[in-house]
Amino acid sequence: MKTLPKERRYETFSYLPPLSDAQIARQIQYAIDQGYHPCVEFNETSNAEIRYWTMWKLPLFNCTNAQDVLNEVQQCRSEYPNCFIRVVAFDNIKQCQVMSFIVYKPNQANSGYSGYRY
């Protein structure tokens, strides 16, 4: 019996093929269009028991396009190259987090792919 190689899965999107930069931008733009406030967070590990990640600056309350968020991701990535980076969207009406996904994994940095996700 052939089994699939063990691969660590992080969140819902990790079960899909790697997202391109354009697909990540569309996900972020969807969150902005829904009225959610994006935020960039980073952490050295992505273990499930780690519930609190460090915020990169404050949430982007006045953000109107995905490129602003991607610029913050790039700044965070250059400052903390050995950390996982994720984008989180907050709903200020429900007062909760409604979306989050990892856009950068440090162990894939030298794979030759220039995208945000892998």
Swiss-Prot record:
GO molecular function: ribulose-bisphosphate carboxylase activity
Xref: SMART domains: RuBisCO_small
A GO BP annotation: photorespiration
Cellular component GO terms held in the UniProt record: carboxysome
Keyword Magnesium applies: no
Membrane-spanning segments: none
One Pfam family from the record: RuBisCO_small
Xref: InterPro entries: RuBisCO_ssu, RuBisCO_ssu_dom, RuBisCO_ssu_sf
Major localisation: other
Top-rank lineage group of the source organism: Bacteria
Entry keyword set: Bacterial microcompartment, Calvin cycle, Carbon dioxide fixation, Carboxysome, Photorespiration, Photosynthesis
Keyword Nuclease: no
CDD domains: RuBisCO_small
Localization per record: Carboxysome
Additional free-text comment from the UniProt record: RuBisCO folding and assembly commences when the nascent large subunit folds with the help of chaperonin GroEL-GroES. Both RbcX and Raf1 help folded RbcL release from the chaperonin and dimerize. Dimeric Raf1 binds to RbcL(2) leading to an RbcL8-Raf1(8) complex. RbcS displaces Raf1, resulting in holoenzyme formation. The basic functional RuBisCO is composed of a large chain homodimer in a 'head-to-tail' conformation. In form I RuBisCO this homodimer is arranged in a barrel-like tetramer with the small subunits forming a tetrameric 'cap' on each end of the 'barrel'.
The protein's assembly and partners: Heterohexadecamer of 8 large and 8 small subunits.
Protein purpose: RuBisCO catalyzes two reactions: the carboxylation of D-ribulose 1,5-bisphosphate, the primary event in carbon dioxide fixation, as well as the oxidative fragmentation of the pentose substrate in the photorespiration process. Both reactions occur simultaneously and in competition at the same active site. Although the small subunit is not catalytic it is essential for maximal activity.
Xref: HAMAP family: RuBisCO_S_bact
Entry's family note: Belongs to the RuBisCO small chain family.
Name this polypeptide is given: Ribulose bisphosphate carboxylase small subunit
Species assigned in the record: Thermosynechococcus vestitus (strain NIES-2133 / IAM M-273 / BP-1)
Encoding gene (name): cbbS
